[in-house]
Structure formats: C-alpha cells, structure tokens
Amino acid sequence: FTYLKKWYPGANVQILSASKEKFRNLGIKEPIIDIKHKKYKDDHECTKFKYLKLSNNKKFDFYLIIPVISDPFEINDFKKMVPHATEWNTYTMSEYNDTDTSPVDFPIGVGKNHLGLFFDKSILEKQNIIKNPYAVVYIQSSGDGLLHSRYCFLSFVEMVISKTKYKSFKTFEVVIPYWIVEDINEYYPFKKKCLEIFKKYYNEIHLVTKDESIELYNSKRINCKRIDSKRINSKRINSNKTSKKQSNKTSKKQNNKTHKKIILRGDILPQSREKFIGFIQGSIKDILLTGDESLVDTLNCCKGKTIWYHIAPWKKNLAENLYSETGNKNYKTYKTSCGNMKGYKFKNDIDKLIKENDFRIKGKARFDSALICFHENNNNKESV
C-alpha cells in the first residue's frame, strides 16, 4: 500500500480487507472497504470469494490480491465478489517464498525468481519500559501448528545466557509472547526445563504476567532454608559450633558470588508496530523471530542484529533461501535456526540479502509492466 502510494502519487489506492483492525494496528488510517461474509459474522479471512461481499461496490481499474489463498487462483471465483474483474485488471501476489500457491504474478520473497522483501525506512517509538539489558523473543506457539516452539525458545535462551558478552548483566530480561507464560504456568515439564537452564547462571528467576510478578526461583531463600535445617540438626546432636562454621562458610560463598537475576516479561507483547520496532531496536544483538513482518522490520531498523529464525513448516522455503543469500548455515535446519551452542562465529551477509532482494527495485519494474499492459489493453479495442 505504501509503495503504491509513493510510486503512483496520482492514483487512488484503496484497501479492501476482511481484517480492518490489522491495518489500523500498522498505522494505516486511510479508509478501508470491508469485505464481509454473505451469511456469517465470524472470521472469514481464508474464505473463497464467492461467499464474500464488499461493503462498498465502488469500481476500481486495477486489483491486486495479496496473499493468494487458493491454488491456483481462480478469476471466476473473484468475479463472484467483483463482477467487472478480468485477467487484464486482476493480479496476484504470494506470501514470502510461498510455494503452495504458485504461479502468481508477484512472487515476493528471497532468492532467485522472487521479487524481494518489503524494505522501507523504519518508523519507531523508542521503548522506555525496560531499563535493564533485554532480549526479544517473538515466535508462534505449538498450538499454531508448530511442534518445536518450546524447543526453539529453550535453544535461544540457553545460547544467549551462555554468551560471555551477556554474562556480566546482573539483571537480564527477556520479552516473551504470552503463550510462553501460559506454558510455564500450566505445563510442568516445560517449566522444569526452563528452570534447569536458568539456574546455571542466575540466582533469581522471575516471571512477569499482565497481572502479577511471580518468583519462580531464589537461591537465597533456598540457602536460608538449608542453613536453618543444618542448625536444627546440629542442636539435636549437640554440635552447634560446627553448624555455625558451616553456615558462615556458606554465607561467605554466597556473598562473594555476584547475585544475578533473570526476568521473563510476558506483560509487554503485543504492541503496535512502531512500539514493537522500538523494542527490537533497544534489545541485545541476538533476537528470535518468526513470520514475515517482524523479520523485515528487524532488517529495516537494525541490520546489525543477528536474527535467529523459528522455521514454520510453511516457511521452510524462506529459511532455505535466507541461508543461500546470507550464507548463515544456522538457517539450514530448525535444530540450529533458533540458537546454536556449538559455535557463535558464522557467515551472515545481511548487506547482500538487502541489496539483492529489495522489492522497491524488483517489484517496481514488474508493477510498471503490469500497468502498461493494462493501459494498452484498455485503450486497444482489438485486444482480446
């Protein structure tokens, strides 16, 4: 939408959508024509066009369908909603590196035969909520069809907290999606594994929800209980002096060791796009993401970040092409794409990725061609 407004300033560009709020959250304030179901009021994002209707029957010269949900795209289905649609004025666009709906007119994504990513100047709002160093995790849950979501999160945090450059942080925070909060609270094996990893480096572990702050672990409290237990036992065997010596030694060891805390922040997300980009910018160099928008937003604002990527089954092709373009071997498999303990040094040519996969260059050329074809056909009565 933003590209078309910039490229063709004289054109009237409008959005037709079944999810108006998503565009509002992206900061788009222009009028949006609602797409509604002919019978139902519930979610209908992935419904065939023949079951849908427009809230406004305004006619347009040119239609771009993004993303395509049927394979292949059926112009006759679209005509049920837009009767004057033709093969000359209707074009299709895929999601990034989508292989399920090809062929399309605008195959966006990374690599050969794709038109690039939607790069643009970032608009962000600097975050002022978190004062300590922090990491950002923004991935989908297992409930969304991703079987290795928990594994992905654990791989990332274990890698990050073990890095020497982050070990000096006395308090470290991790911004997490709310499904991780729910899994920690409701699925004990996951909670147990989280605690096992964090206890290696931190004396305190806190989980912040939208309603409360929960202390999951505190080594000071445990040591106090142990010392008290030793004192009770020593009285029973009349060896109180020995007990005091042991407790003093334990206390000295704890005092000499830096007390470190990790806070899992489940109270931050979701945010508007501008605020979310602000959180990305202020975070440590390593970041864990999934999906399209967050990936491109991070490349736009902060190309110096090391992006660890949660590979969804339907994004495998994107990950493979990210590997081809950047040389980052971690993108080859989900086992290393979220975090890799075996080695931190690897090729990651982000400059090449951005330079050779810019939709503003590749996409503009194809849009110009499409509009020329439309114009020629519209003004040539002999065209079929």
Language-model features, listed with the residues they occupy:
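Active-site and donor-binding regions of nucleotide-sugar-utilizing enzymes
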Residues: 1-107, 179-184
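Catalytic binding pocket for nucleotide-activated donors in carbohydrate/polymer assembly enzymes
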Residues: 283-284, 290-361
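Histidine-anchored nucleotide/phosphate-binding helix
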Residues: 1-9, 148-164
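C-terminal alpha-helical cap of glycosyltransferases
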Residues: 361-384
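Compositionally biased low-complexity segments enriched in polar/charged residues
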Residues: 218-257, 382-384
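Donor nucleotide-activated moiety binding/catalytic core segment of transferases
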Residues: 49, 54, 202-220, 225, ...
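Short His-Asn-centered micro-motif
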Residues: 16-17, 65-68, 91, 138-139, ...
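A nucleotide-sugar donor-handling region in carbohydrate enzymes
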Residues: 86-150, 178
